[in-house]
Every structure is written in structure tokens, then in C-alpha cells.
Amino acid sequence: MIAQGPSNGPFGGAPGPHIDPAVAAVIFDDFFSIHKNSSDEVDWLISAIQGTNTVECKTQYNGSGGELVLTSGTTTGDGDHMQWHHVGFKPLETLGRDIWFAAMVALSHIGVELGVGLANQNTDFSDTGLTNGIYFHRATDGTTTARARDGGDDEDTEISDPLSSAGVYCELGFHVTSAIATFYVNGSRVAEASAEIPWGTPLGPFVGLVTGGDAARAVAVDWIKVIQLR
């Protein structure tokens, strides 16, 4: 089993770069196109948190296409939650069943609430909408938390705002072993969690945004990748 390439942060020790499906389950989306639906089993499911919002693939910040852009409506609180339709990744207290997650994200404006990571359901990511997950949460004032949530109980670690500059991509990721979740920003370890990991709960990758002002604001996603050893 070949070790993962130069991204040593959240993917350190992961299988790859060419992953044998007998070794691990993997989702990788580079967003040159998107299959989406509001209710059926078509890749990404979209739930409106509030308002009329858009989800599309276009060139946003990196100049070469292949970017997913979620744009809110123009009223404070407008936004979407987007999640993979099948929650197929399960944190396990079993050696050798590790999970690796990362996403490359950027904000069009710093006044955005953002959620990105793994969660148990396609619903409002803000406040108490999600009952189980492992993810990053960023409030509209920039307060950013590395969070493990189990049955609505949180283990939060506040970290420096990694998205304090609009239009700049940042890699947010984590590695979950049989005992601990370690969070990374641009490959550097920033937090750990162990008390509220939702052991045994099926999770799926998600991205969500809410605008913090009466203006359309967006989150761009260059790519998302999830791996779990079988």
C-alpha cells in the first residue's frame, strides 16, 4: 500500500495516490460538473436553509474551472446545505478503519457562516441542525471551531480563522483513527477531539453556507476528498 503524496496533513498515511477499491472506500469530486438533486439519490443533495440560493460549477478563483460555487440569496440568513446523498463513512473504534477528509474552500466575503466536513444528515448545519458529525464551523464574525458532535453534544476547539481573507483558498481537513480526530489547516495540525466522536454513525461529506448580511455571498470549493479503510 503506497503512502499518500505531498499533502502530509490530513492525508498523511492514507492509501494512494491510486487507491485499490478493495483497500478503501473513496469519494473525490473535482467539480468540473455536478450532479445535484433536492430529494433523490443523485450524488449531491441540496437543502435550502433559507431563501433562494444557487449551486453551480464555474471558474471562480483559480482560473482553470472545476470549482463548485454555492451562492446565497440577498437576505441575512439565506443559504444552502449540500451533502453527498449516501452517508457511507462511519467512525469506528476499530484499528485499521481510519477516515481521512479534506476540502479546498474559499469565501467571497468574510461575513459568511460556513460548515464543511462529515455529517449524518442533509439539514441546516448551523446551530443545532446537525446531531452527529466531524467538521469545521465558521461563524459570520470569523470565530472558527474544529468540532466533533455526538448526539447533539459538542467537543469544540476554537482555532484561528483560516478564511480571514476573501478569495483565498484554504485546505481544511481531518484524520480520524480508532481513538481520536486530528484537524488540519493547510497541512498543519490545529486541534484534536476524542470525547464526542460519533462512533458507529454513518456520515457523509457536506458543505454549507449562510450569508451574514443582506447581500449574496458565496463559498467556492475546488475539491473534496474522503477515504476510509475497509
Question: For each predicted feature, which ranges?
Answer:
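Extracellular carbohydrate-recognition regions
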Residues: 2-48
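Extracellular beta-strand elements of beta-rich domains used
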Residues: 31-32, 221-226
